[in-house]
């Protein structure tokens, strides 16, 4: 690969290693230019240029989704509310999405997954 500095080649190599490691762990990505980029994000001003995901990204277009998020340092009530809210929404056929941060986000996803959510 001529025309690249050693630092640029190292960055390219690191990105390729990271991509392979992510794929080995079932983590993929898509950009706004990809066909499987969620339609619901395309219409948003300043939508993410890149999103990482696990599982079937196509369900983002096939089902209703809602983000359930909250504090990383949540109270017991916050944990319970996050869990129960996601449980209820999942039972109504709604996908739960968030950034999987510690705290409320984690309990929200656990509420979805414990109830066969997507």
Summary of predicted features, one role per range:
Residues 30, 36-118:
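Glycine-rich beta-alpha loop segments
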